[in-house]
């Protein structure tokens, strides 16, 4: 079917060019969007014509209904859809015949005319001129059933965006949220900065990195798992309020909440601590939810999440003691391991840090509304400052929403001797087989030796946050082009043939 369809369209293109018509012209003067047309002329009554108002519009043809010497068709741009009406006694018989023969669903056209409302009350453009702007060689998914196979959606996101207004709105929300974040931070005196994607040493998170090779120096390098250590170098250098929005890469599994490539924001503020960063996190996310959703109580997968501040703050030690009956500071490893075994949790690595991490995972699922889990043990927080009241703990928090970690923040460790010792402990864990433990970063220790002011640091996983504001069940639904298992092109074409409802 696809082969025959493309051949037919290619023949049409050849026919157009033989008539002196270029099916892929260079530009068109589009004056209004679909939304602007609706907003400007929605006051018209059914059957009312406003011939004195001239407008131009361009978009993709999504449907056509031919009626003899006339046709109604719907066009779509990135703000929505608008109906248009063309007839022979307006554009001329030759152009009408050309429209019937060569303007097809999926093509882009530009129109000029005036607004009116049909007898049924639908705002419509009365076409006086039209220009073919781009011929589509492939058929669109059938309107009502759309795309059946989610893998097609993820591999060919452009298809979903073409046929689904909901998909356009989902990603518009995502992109608007990023804009809101920038406006929020810029208005508070933060500067957006850039740090390297290629790292000599991984750091800033516990994760398995992607390894690449730099030919010019004949050395292995790593795609960053987090920008943290470079951002703190900027704080050491003299910047005081900075943030970076960008991609991180972790060579780990894919799930509904994990992607090997993901977007995060990290924020650092000199002379602040983790209490200040908690306040900032709450204010920032409240602003994002309010401006993208219009309310602080949103529905996510059938459950309500209430973002109304103030958010609950719970000490990790107290939380795990209440829920599981274990004391992560006092109980020996054997007690923690036994509790995990009671829940059927299997561990490849059984050091204390992993035991505590897995215990935390058991109970975070029940936290639906935003909750700060605070004051983590030193053993699982190698970059956080020791707690001012209990040196076994750190001044760290994680923000949990709907059972998922959304943010992680510290009073940043700025004691170079303490940091060096913790890197040594992490290096020992790597030697024992923990590939996610931090590498030794002697240059970062050297930078700390020049002095870093008291600093609050914060990282937010933006994709997970965007899942909530778009009510998306999986992280791949909010990443425009997510990583999927590759297929041969021929297999994808076969999948295309069978992937649509007819």
UniProtKB/Swiss-Prot annotation:
Gene3D superfamilies: Bira Bifunctional Protein, Domain 2, Nucleic acid-binding proteins. GO terms for biological process: lysyl-tRNA aminoacylation. One of its GO terms (molecular function) is lysine-tRNA ligase activity. It is an enzyme of class 6 (ligase). GO terms for cellular component: cytosol. Its cofactor is Mg(2+). The keyword Cytoplasm applies. It is found in: Cytoplasm. This is Lysine--tRNA ligase. It comes from Thermotoga petrophila (strain ATCC BAA-488 / DSM 13995 / JCM 10881 / RKU-1). The gene is lysS.
């Amino acid at each position: 079917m696809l082969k025959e369809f493309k051949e037919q369209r290619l023949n049409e293109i050849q026919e157009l060019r033989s008539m002196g018509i270029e099916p892929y012209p260079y530009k068109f003067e589009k004056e209004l969007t679909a939304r602007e047309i609706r907003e400007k002329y929605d006051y018209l009554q059914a059957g009312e014509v406003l011939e004195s108002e001239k407008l131009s519009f361009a978009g993709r043809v999504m449907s056509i209904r031919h009626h003899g010497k006339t046709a109604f068709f719907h066009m779509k741009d990135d703000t929505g859809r608008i109906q248009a009406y063309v007839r022979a006694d307006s554009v001329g018989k030759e152009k009408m015949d050309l429209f019937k023969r060569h303007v097809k669903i999926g093509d882009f056209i530009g129109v000029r005319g005036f607004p009116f409302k049909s007898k049924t009350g639908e705002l419509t453009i009365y076409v006086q001129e039209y220009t073919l702007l781009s011929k589509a060689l492939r058929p669109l998914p059938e309107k009502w059933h759309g795309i059946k196979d989610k893998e097609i959606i993820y591999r060919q996101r452009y298809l979903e965006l073409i046929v689904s207004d909901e998909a356009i709105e989902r990603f518009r929300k995502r992109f608007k949220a990023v804009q809101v974040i920038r406006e929020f931070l810029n208005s508070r005196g933060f500067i957006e900065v850039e740090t390297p994607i290629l790292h000599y040493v991984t750091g800033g998170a516990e994760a398995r990195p992607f390894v690449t090779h730099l030919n010019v120096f004949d050395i292995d390098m790593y795609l960053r798992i987090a920008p943290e250590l470079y951002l703190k170098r900027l704080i050491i250098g003299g910047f005081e309020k900075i943030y970076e929005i960008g991609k991180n890469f972790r060579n780990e599994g894919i799930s509904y909440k994990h992607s090997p490539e993901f977007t995060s924001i990290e924020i650092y503020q000199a002379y602040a601590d983790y209490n200040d960063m908690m306040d900032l996190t709450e204010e920032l996310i409240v602003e994002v939810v309010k401006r993208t959703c219009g309310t602080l109580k949103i529905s996510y997968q059938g459950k309500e999440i209430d973002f109304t501040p103030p958010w609950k703050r719970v000490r990790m030690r107290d939380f795990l003691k209440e829920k599981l009956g274990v004391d992560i500071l006092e109980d020996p490893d054997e007690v923690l391991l036994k509790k995990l075994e009671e829940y059927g949790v299997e561990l490849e690595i059984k050091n204390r840090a992993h035991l505590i991490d897995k215990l935390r995972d058991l109970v975070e699922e029940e936290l639906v509304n935003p909750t700060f889990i605070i004051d983590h043990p030193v053993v699982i927080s190698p970059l956080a400052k020791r707690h001012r009241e209990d040196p076994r703990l750190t001044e760290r928090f994680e923000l949990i929403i709907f059972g998922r970690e959304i943010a992680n923040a510290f009073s940043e460790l700025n004691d170079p001797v303490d940091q060096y010792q913790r890197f040594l402990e992490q290096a020992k864990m790597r030697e024992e087989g923990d590939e996610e433990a931090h590498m030794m970063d002697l240059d970062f220790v050297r930078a700390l030796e020049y002095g870093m002011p008291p600093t609050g640091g914060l990282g937010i996983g933006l994709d997970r946050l965007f899942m909530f504001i778009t009510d998306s069940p999986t992280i791949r639904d909010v990443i425009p082009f997510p990583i999927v298992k590759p297929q041969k092109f021929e297999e994808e074409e076969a999948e295309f043939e069978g992937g649509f409802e007819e």
